[in-house]
Amino acid sequence: MGYNYVSLIVTILLVVITSPVVFGNDAAPIPENKGRIEQWFNTNVKQNGRGHFKTITEAINSVRAGNTRRVIIKIGPGVYKEKVTIDRSKPFITLYGHPNAMPVLTFDGTAAQYGTVDSATLIVLSDYFMAVNIILKNSAPMPDGKRKGAQALSMRISGNKAAFYNCKFYGYQDTICDDTGNHFFKDCYIEGTFDFIFGSGRSLYLGTQLNVVGDGIRVITAHAGKSAAEKSGYSFVHCKVTGTGTGIYLGRSWMSHPKVVYAYTDMSSVVNPSGWQENREAGRDKTVFYGEYKCTGTGSHKEKRVKYTQDIDDIEAKYFISLGYIQGSSWLLPPPSF
C-alpha cells in the first residue's frame, strides 16, 4: 500500500515555564455522571504557566538536549511516514495537531525487524510528554499466527508524567506499550486485537474507546505487574469497550501481579461473559487484581465472571477514579489551545 506524502510545515512554539506543576485536587473522584466530567477536569487541572520543518523527526531533533521549556510542535494535516523516537534527554515536548484535521504518524515496524518494544511508530523515552489530536498507526499487517515477530506497536511510552488528549492509536497485537511511569489518556481511541495495552505503566484512561477488531480470542490488557508492592496498574474510567465477535477478554495475567480496573465503563456484548482470561499459571488467581466498579452494558454482567474478579466497593474505587492514582495534580496540564 502506498502513501501520499504531504509536504507541510511543522512549527515549533516555545513556552517558558517556571515549574511543570499544576495545582489541582488529587482526591476529587471522577464523577459517576458522565456529563459532569469536563467540569471536573477543568476544575482539577489548571495551567500555571520558530522554526519550520517538513518532518516530525527534524522538529524533534532541533530541540536541544536538557531542554527545560515546554516545546509545542504544531503538526499540519497529512500523513507522515516516519519512525520517531524522543530521547530521554528531551523532556517537555508536546505534539499538537488540529482537531478537525488530525495528522497521521505511521510506520510499519515489526518485532521481527526491531524487537517488540522498539517496533513502535512513536517511542517516547522522555518525561512530561504530551500529544494532542494526533493519530498514531502501525501499518504492518495483522498477525496471522504463522509469521514470527508480527507484533507491531503504534506507540511505546516509557517516560514519566505523559498525557494524551484526543489521540487515536491503531494497531493489532501490542498496539500500545504503556511501559513505565504515570500516564493520562483522555478522550482517546485505541484499537487492537491481542494484548493491545501492555506493560508496567501506572495509567488513568478517561473517556477512551477500546475497540477490538478481528475474530477469535482477543485480549485488551496485559499488565506486567510482577509483585504486590509494585506501584503500577491501569484504571479505565468512563471508557467504552466495542468491537467484533464475542471472545473479548478485559485482561490476562501475562505476569504474576497484574492490576487492572474498569469503572463506569460501557461494555458491549463483545465482552466474553467470564470477563477475564483464565490464568494458565498455577496460583495466579490469588495474585491478580481485576476490578470492576459500576460498569454498564451487556458485557458488564457479573453472573459468569471468573471467581477472582473484584467487585470493588465505593471506598476501594476512590483510589482508582481520581487524579491521585497517577499523582496528577502535581504535573498534569490541560491541552494547549490555539
From Swiss-Prot:
Keywords: Aspartyl esterase, Cell wall, Cell wall biogenesis/degradation, Hydrolase, Secreted, Signal. GO terms for cellular component: extracellular region. It is found in: Secreted, Cell wall. The record marks 173 as: Transition state stabilizer. Substrate binds at residues 116, 151, 252. InterPro entries: Pectin_lyas_fold, Pectin_lyase_fold/virulence, Pectinesterase_cat. Residues 1-24 form the signal peptide. Pathway: Glycan metabolism; pectin degradation; 2-dehydro-3-deoxy-D-gluconate from pectin: step 1/5. One of its GO terms (biological process) is pectin catabolic process. The active site is at residues 174, 195. Gene3D superfamilies: Single-stranded right-handed beta-helix, Pectin lyase-like. Its main location: secreted. It comes from the Eukaryota. Its EC number is 3.1.1.11. One of its GO terms (molecular function) is pectinesterase activity. It catalyses: [(1->4)-alpha-D-galacturonosyl methyl ester](n) + n H2O = [(1->4)-alpha-D-galacturonosyl](n) + n methanol + n H(+). PANTHER family: ACYL-COA THIOESTER HYDROLASE YBHC-RELATED (PTHR31321), PECTINESTERASE 63-RELATED (PTHR31321:SF87). Belongs to the pectinesterase family. Acts in the modification of cell walls via demethylesterification of cell wall pectin. This is Putative pectinesterase 63. It comes from Arabidopsis thaliana (Mouse-ear cress). The gene is PME63.
